[in-house]
């Protein structure tokens, strides 16, 4: 006896025994959940196997190597060209203003807080900033640096990428960003870097390594007693540095991103964050954020968190996942015989470097770097300075002051081709199953045609809904049209609209949705809407897809391959050519699919991105991360992919630059010189464009 499916029961309960649409909004979240579950299970097994010192040491070596591999490789050390440009004295400490270069002409402004009392060499502390717009001038960060200096520590505080004097997208003032936040100063260039095989993670961690180079070599510092600390993004930067630099003797991570993306109760799209905190391909590699701290064991480590951070700053799973992974790392410390060197602290206060969190930092560093176990119960007197009084550069912007490099200029200068690579591998495409067929959910009449609601299974947990409009009298030589646009299949289905109009002219039309589009627009995650609302956009799902090794552009190309295969097998389409048409942000996946499927006879692209190189060359851009493919510019670009389709015809109508501006046809032709590519000046998405 064939069991009755849940879907059939629900349909019957609704009074309609024929069909019931799926909740397609679950498809992309469920697909990612499957990838997350596999990554979590793998890492859990591997961590559970760390029962000997030898196993731990092997894992530590693996974690460091995996980190450098994922972020783009360890850069070459170049001269720092450090120089002191000013300073001042305060009661109990003095401040030196200095600048150095983490890469040639890539300037890092920093402050060195030196104790006025005691005798050198002092233990050194690298203080790393959270995402404060004013960087090292942020009030609570100043207080911590001032207090540490008065407690006998030599402290180096530097502006991170895109913050303070390193604002790379300044407004008219020259010192404030014109972007929405410091996060955007990180992620705007960080997304560009992915196309060229680089990452914001690599840039940020190398800035920290070079800062530690300066601190370790300072005549007042004891290179055997170096630590790193920071709050929020600075805590995460401390984690990055702990993964790669053995010179650290202690660390305090305060409200850092201590949440794995692949966690026990993964809540799609998961704990994605700004660019440097997302490890592309980390999922299939078995690497996640807590692996950053594995190479640091068994050195003294304090992980300090805010109990309110799971209510909006980080994901709703932040605390429970952090505690679970802390226990795993604590077990590693115990295997190494130093369970006393790792601790967890919580504050009930909101996200910030609060007074109690600062005291925890002082006491941890005093205990392990100064051999002072007695707890400090009161912070030394502090008095934050004005932003301008801490400027190292004239005018408060190092790029303008010294005509230096930016992340974008470094990226453009360093871009090199390394040779061809299979497009299928870059995209991580999943080919459709042999014999794939569309499932007809319903069939109904319309004026002059028949409309079918069909569904195609593309991957595990992913079904693609589509409308198939079948003319009463199909034109004998007309190809089947498979059409996709970012507004989804329901945008133009009505009698007087595009799809039915084309069908009444004799064209078989399939208007479909792919992952993240139309009915497959993903549902919100569960939990506090202060977090789940802002983290439910396409970019968050694109980041999650990249982390789990399945670029969203590749997923959408896979969907189109499945739809094309199913259409070719449909009785009404057999023997007909297949034409694929895409508009706007769907053009890149369509080009990929057509290049990979030689049975797609022709391709029409309206209003699509002209090239990935145009994204690299743009200072600002609107091209979406969902269309980006990591490392693609090392091997190829969109014009070459279009040329690879020859002799099949490709039409580019109204191609746009990275900011979405329509380009002159002559400029597009200069890039697309292949004989099989026709360039049209204006984007069209109407009967005239799609019928021929």
Regions found by a protein language model. Name each.
Residues 1-13:
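N-terminal secretory signal peptides and thylakoid transit peptides that target proteins
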Residues 15-108, 289-291, 297-299, 304-465, ...:
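Alpha/beta-hydrolase-fold serine-hydrolase catalytic core, especially in secreted/extracellular enzymes
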Residues 113, 128, 158, 229-231, ...:
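Generic beta-strand/beta-sheet core signal
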Residues 120, 124-209, 216, 262-267, ...:
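Cap/lid segment of the alpha/beta-hydrolase catalytic domain
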Residues 132-140, 178-181, 195-203, 228-239, ...:
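Alpha-helix capping and helix-loop boundary segments enriched in small/acidic/polar residues
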Residues 146, 239-240, 294, 500, ...:
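Alpha-helical segments flanking ligand/cofactor-binding loops in enzyme cores
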Residues 158-164, 172-190, 199-206, 221, ...:
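Aromatic-lined carbohydrate-binding surfaces of glycoside hydrolases
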Residues 213-284, 563-635, 641:
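Primarily recognizes the serine-hydrolase "nucleophile elbow" in alpha/beta-hydrolase
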């Amino acid at each position: 006896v064939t069991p009755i499916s849940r879907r059939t029961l629900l349909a019957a309960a609704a009074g309609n025994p024929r069909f019931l649409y799926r909740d397609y909004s679950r498809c992309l979240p469920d697909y990612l959940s499957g990838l997350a579950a596999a990554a979590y299970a793998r890492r859990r097994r591997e961590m559970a196997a760390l029962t000997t010192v030898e196993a731990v040491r092997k894992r530590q070596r693996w974690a460091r190597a995996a980190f450098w591999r994922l972020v783009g490789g360890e850069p070459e050390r170049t001269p720092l060209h450090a120089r002191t440009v000013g300073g001042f004295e305060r009661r109990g400490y003095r401040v030196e203003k200095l600048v150095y270069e983490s890469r040639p002409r890539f300037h890092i402004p920093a402050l060195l807080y030196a104790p006025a009392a005691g005798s050198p060499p002092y233990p050194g502390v690298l203080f790393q900033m959270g995402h404060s717009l004013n960087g090292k001038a942020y009030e609570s960060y100043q207080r911590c640096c001032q207090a540490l200096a008065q407690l006998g520590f030599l402290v180096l505080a530097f502006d991170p990428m895109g913050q303070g004097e390193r604002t790379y997208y300044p407004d008219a003032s020259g010192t404030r960003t014109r972007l929405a936040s410091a996060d955007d100063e990180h992620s705007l260039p960080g997304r560009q870097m992915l196309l060229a095989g680089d990452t914001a993670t690599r840039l940020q961690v190398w800035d920290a390594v070079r800062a530690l180079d300066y601190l370790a070599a300072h005549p007042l510092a004891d290179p055997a007693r170096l630590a790193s600390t920071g709050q929020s993004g600075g805590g995460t930067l401390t984690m990055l540095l702990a993964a790669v630099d053995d010179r650290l003797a202690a660390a305090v991570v305060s409200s850092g991103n201590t949440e794995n993306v692949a966690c026990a109760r993964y809540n799609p799209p998961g704990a994605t964050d700004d660019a440097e905190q997302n490890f592309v391909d980390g999922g299939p590699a078995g690497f996640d954020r807590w692996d950053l701290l594995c190479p640091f064991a068994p050195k003294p480590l304090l992980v300090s968190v805010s109990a309110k951070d799971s209510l909006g700053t980080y994901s709703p799973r932040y605390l429970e996942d952090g505690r679970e992974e802390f226990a795993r790392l604590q077990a590693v410390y115990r295997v190494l015989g130093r369970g006393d060197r790792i601790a967890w602290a919580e504050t009930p206060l909101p996200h910030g470097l609060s007074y109690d969190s600062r005291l925890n930092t002082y006491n941890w560093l005093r205990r392990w770097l100064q051999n002072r176990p007695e707890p400090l119960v009161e912070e030394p007197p502090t008095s934050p300075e004005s932003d301008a009084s801490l400027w190292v550069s004239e005018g408060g912007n190092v790029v303008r002051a010294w005509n230096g490099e930016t992340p974008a200029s470094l990226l453009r200068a360093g871009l090199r081709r390394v040779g061809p690579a299979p497009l299928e591998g870059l995209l991580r495409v999943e080919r459709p199953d042999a014999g794939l067929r569309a499932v007809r959910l319903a069939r109904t009449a319309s004026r002059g045609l028949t409309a079918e609601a069909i569904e195609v299974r593309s991957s595990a947990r992913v079904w693609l809904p589509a409308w198939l409009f079948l003319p009463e009298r199909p034109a004998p030589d007309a190809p089947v049209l498979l059409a996709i646009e970012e507004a989804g299949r329901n945008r133009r289905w009505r009698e007087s609209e595009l799809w039915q109009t084309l069908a009444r002219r004799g064209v078989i039309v399939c208007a479909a949705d792919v992952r993240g589009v139309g009915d497959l627009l993903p549902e919100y995650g569960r939990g506090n809407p202060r977090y789940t609302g802002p983290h439910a956009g396409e970019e968050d799902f694109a980041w999650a897809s990249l982390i789990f090794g399945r670029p969203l552009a590749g997923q959408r190309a896979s969907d189109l391959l499945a739809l094309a295969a199913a259409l070719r097998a449909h009785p009404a389409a057999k023997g007909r050519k297949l034409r694929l048409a895409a508009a706007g942000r769907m053009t890149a996946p369509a080009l990929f699919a057509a290049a990979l499927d030689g049975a797609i006879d022709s391709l029409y692209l309206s209003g699509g991105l002209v090239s990935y190189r145009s994204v690299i060359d743009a200072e600002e851009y609107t091209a979406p991360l969902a269309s980006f493919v990591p490392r693609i510019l090392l091997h190829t670009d969109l014009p070459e992919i279009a040329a690879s389709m020859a002799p099949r015809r490709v039409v580019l109508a109204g191609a746009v630059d990275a900011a979405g501006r329509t380009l002159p046809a002559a400029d597009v032709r200069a890039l697309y010189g292949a004989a099989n590519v026709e360039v049209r000046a204006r984007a069209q998405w109407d009967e005239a464009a799609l019928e021929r």
